[in-house]
């Protein structure tokens, strides 16, 4: 990225969203205004215990989606029922921060989520009590970076958005302002 480029969503957060949140929650200090710290994208590949080539597909997909090489996750303990031994690769994860994080969030909200068939919005009940939000996607084909003809199998992923919000209400308000399409009480998307 060039030196003077600032991601679109980051600019919107700094110019509009911070002021709205300050007015909504009446923070005394600007450092109390919630922001996004990092995004963790995790892809678990449990079948990699039987076929080690499957983990390579997950790594390639995550690299294409996030633009960053994923970290290989290995099993911490052996579990005989799953035919799993300690140290076997069972997943991959990427931690995005800074401009890459803002770009990924922008692509996720404007391109990927609207491409999901029969998408009615994300549940707003998946906060962890400290303003962090985790949701899962069932397949990786909704991202334009993935060539549908070249994928060997559909893989789901978990995406965690870590914020500096203290409560779930602050985190929910921040993500709603950023453009997260949360479901309403009736199960349909809120406007």
From Swiss-Prot:
Coiled coil: none annotated. Keywords: Ribonucleoprotein, Ribosomal protein, RNA-binding, rRNA-binding, tRNA-binding. InterPro entries: Ribosomal_uL5, Ribosomal_uL5_bac-type, Ribosomal_uL5_C, Ribosomal_uL5_dom_sf, Ribosomal_uL5_N. GO terms for biological process: translation. GO terms for cellular component: ribonucleoprotein complex; ribosome. Pfam families: Ribosomal_L5 (PF00281), Ribosomal_L5_C (PF00673). One of its GO terms (molecular function) is rRNA binding. Belongs to the universal ribosomal protein uL5 family. This is one of the proteins that bind and probably mediate the attachment of the 5S RNA into the large ribosomal subunit, where it forms part of the central protuberance. In the 70S ribosome it contacts protein S13 of the 30S subunit (bridge B1b), connecting the 2 subunits; this bridge is implicated in subunit movement. Contacts the P site tRNA; the 5S rRNA and some of its associated proteins might help stabilize positioning of ribosome-bound tRNAs. Part of the 50S ribosomal subunit; part of the 5S rRNA/L5/L18/L25 subcomplex. Contacts the 5S rRNA and the P site tRNA. Forms a bridge to the 30S subunit in the 70S ribosome. NCBIfam families: PRK00010.1 (NF000585). This is Large ribosomal subunit protein uL5. The gene is rplE.
